A protein has these predicted regions:
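C-terminal recognition in membrane/secretory proteostasis and scaffolding
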Residues: 1-29, 45, 131, 145, ...
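Gly/Ser-rich catalytic serine loop of serine hydrolases
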Residues: 10, 88-96, 154-158, 204-219, ...
Length: 346
């Protein structure tokens, strides 16, 4: 029996030694997660950087709840008068992001629309009543301002650099759970066609957003603001079913910052106008499908007409940038300033 056991053990030991000698000739990869710089196991630094700039927003408005049916009695109306309509306070919540040391906060227009009172709660526990600086329903964005010292404006990313697959984090106030954080990736870019606003150019992500998250921050892995969480795509498509299905949409920060600056400086968003109506046409360049703009209408004595553009002209480039997506190009035109000279190639 001893000889049998020895004969079984020795070949096994020999095989292990041989394998060790062979493997020693190769450079083995480092185990995953050993180096924090190689594999990101935590986004706590990014969250710590951005969270002080994210606020909870609470709104209240008086709504008419109808007439008390008892006041339909003519005898009661004789003594109490005809002011029998009742009002009640309707409360709502949302999120916002501090963009300037002066207390300017970007949020969604639908968060604060028609509110009679707006209260902002900061991460450090302080609170303040907010003033509405301006709103832009065309992008569903609004700017508030609070008067508190020591505010921390968030650092802005460049949303034009965002790529599908990038890790993102959503920070907001879902159902009143303030400064909640969820993680996901960018699932798509330049989403539109939802008829939620006039200028749709959303970042799609699967980072969880729920009721109360609107107006909150979508940040990148370094803690910089990439977008403003705006919409939740629900199973029913009408917002009645709020079950999360992993499709959440954020307004890019480049657009949000443009809107914020105009609302602060002018009280409204000043958009460029060429005086043209266009149709989007699909073209096929080799194997790539592109969109171009064909002029289908001209405003009399408008900028385009004065520049010599004609009906049927196809816009190929604006300021040297090839038109690959007609919708995005029209958004870029809207961001131009009145009086700014534009080079249009047809």
């Amino acid at each position: 029996m001893r000889e049998f056991l020895s004969s079984l053990f020795w070949p096994t030991l020999t095989g292990i030694l041989a394998a060790a000698i062979i493997l020693d000739q190769w450079v083995l990869p480092e185990p995953m997660g050993r180096d924090r710089n190689q594999v990101r196991t935590s986004y706590s630094d990014a969250v710590a950087l951005a969270t002080p700039s994210v606020v909870n927003i609470y709104t209240a408005k008086l709504v008419d709840s109808g007439r008390n049916q008892r006041l339909n009695d003519p005898l009661l109306r004789r003594f109490l008068g005809n002011s029998g309509r009742r009002q009640q306070v309707e409360r709502s919540l949302g999120s916002g992001v501090i963009l300037t040391p002066e207390g300017h906060i970007i949020t969604n227009d639908h968060v604060i629309a028609d509110a009679d009172a707006i209260q902002v709660l900061l991460h450090d526990g302080r609170s303040a009543t907010a003033t509405v600086i301006g709103a832009d329903p065309a992008t569903d964005l609004a700017v508030l301002q609070i008067d508190l010292p020591g505010l921390t404006p968030i650092t802005l990313a460049n949303s034009d650099d965002a790529k599908v697959g990038d890790v993102v984090l959503a920070i907001g106030n879902p159902y009143g759970f303030g400064h909640s954080v969820s993680q996901g990736i960018i699932s798509g870019l330049s989403r539109y066609g939802l008829q939620a606003s006039d200028y749709e150019d959303y970042i799609q992500t699967d980072a969880s957003s729920l009721l109360g998250s609107s107006g909150g921050a979508l940040i990148d892995a370094s803690g910089k603001l990439l977008g403003i969480n705006t919409l939740i795509y629900t199973a029913s498509g009408d917002g009645a079913d709020h079950a999360a299905i992993g499709i959440n949409l954020a307004t890019p920060v480049n657009l949000a910052n443009f809107v914020m600056k105009d609302l602060v400086n002018y009280g409204t968003v000043v958009r460029g106008w060429l005086g043209v109506s266009v149709e989007l046409l699909q073209t096929q360049e080799t194997s790539v499908q592109q969109q171009v703009l064909m002029i289908s209408g001209l405003a009399e004595d408008g900028p385009a007409a004065r520049a010599g553009l004609r009906l049927g002209d196809v816009i190929n480039a604006i300021n040297g940038n090839t038109v690959n997506d007609g919708r995005i190009t029209m958004h870029q035109i809207a961001r131009l300033r009145p009086g700014e000279v534009v080079d249009i190639e047809v």
